[in-house]
Structures are given as structure tokens and as C-alpha cells.
Amino acid sequence: MPFVRTCLAALLGLMLGANVLAQSSGSTTMLDTLFAKLQTATDPVAVQSLEAAIWEQWIMVPDGEKRALMMRGIAEMQQRQLKESVDTFSKLIEIAPDLSEAWNKRATAYWLLGNFPASLNDICETVKREPRHFGAYSGLGMIRAEMGEYPRAVAAFELARKHNPHIIGIDDEIDRLKAMGGDKPDDPLGCSQRTAGR
């Protein structure tokens, strides 16, 4: 299923090729620029480069201790040491609670462990801090679809598409899930944070 593979790659955040650097003060400006370019890009190679650059910005960590925890958690996920990666990302969240990608990485580890409630909580924390996180929205959509919450899955995938219109197969997946029916809930994402989904 190409769409699920695409979402999984997004959810994992290109961990295999990630290059964690010290965060610059211009990170937010850089992300704004990258997202603007992603909206208008048409060349597949440019799209892939922009997506990778966005992920790299998300995983940038400002100091050595936090960077070491991020790298260790990513390495543990790559080695399928998922419980250890949860512990590592929990430590990172404790010392850097505003770091959206720490929440997203822990959400991914929880998802891989099959702990959907914990993953959902961390995804909601991710999008509270980074409302453009198309990887988190893709993961949220996959979990909601798996749980049979089709309208919430649609809402999540639509937000993923809003911030990254190049996700392969997302239009077909949204159409498929809309055909499954269901009433749209008051809280479409199920996150309850007012800032989520901007």
C-alpha cells in the first residue's frame, strides 16, 4: 500500500538520513521559507529536497546534551530498541518540553510499540508546538483510520495535505476514508488543543 509506506516514511521523519546540527536563531524563518517553497514546488527532486530540509530543521537541537539525546533516541529507533527510545525521548522532553520533534519521535516509538493512546497524546503535543507538522498529521490520520475514526482520520490527512500537498497517495486515501462515512466530531482531530491544526 503506497500511501501507508509514504506515511510511515513521514512519521519516521527520514531518520536514516537525518543530519542533526546546532539550531540557528533563524530556524523559524528558514522553516517559513521552506514551507512556502514546498507549496509551490513542482519538480519531484525539489519536493524531496524541501521535505528533507524541513525534517532537518525540525530535528535541530540547540545544545550538546539535547542533541545527544535526540541522536541516541533516533539510533535506538533505528535499532528497534523502542522502549529505550521512549525513555530517551522522555528525558529530552523533560529538559526541552517545547521541542516539537522530541514529542513526534516519542509518538513514533509509541506507535511502533502499538501504544496508540500514548502516540495520539504525543502527536497532539507535537502539532500544538508545530502546527505545520505534516508527518505528525499523517501519523494521526493513520492511527485514527486504524481505530475506525474515519472523519478524524480525514481531518488529520487534510491538514497533512494542507502543509505538504505532495504526499503521495493522500488524495486517494482521503477519498477512501470519506466513503467510509461517519459524522464529523466537534473536535475533528481529537486533540482538544485550540492551537492544533492551524
What are these regions (language model features)?
Residues 78, 112, 146-147, 179-183:
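Register position in tetratricopeptide repeats
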Residues 20-71:
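N-terminal leader/linker segments that initiate helical-solenoid repeat arrays
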Residues 49, 56, 60, 159-198:
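Terminal, low-structured helical/coil segments at or just beyond the last alpha-helical repeat
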Residues 63-135:
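Alpha-helical adaptor scaffolds
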Residues 35, 52-55, 70, 90, 101-105, 124, 135-139, 155, ...:
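Alpha-solenoid helical repeat scaffolds
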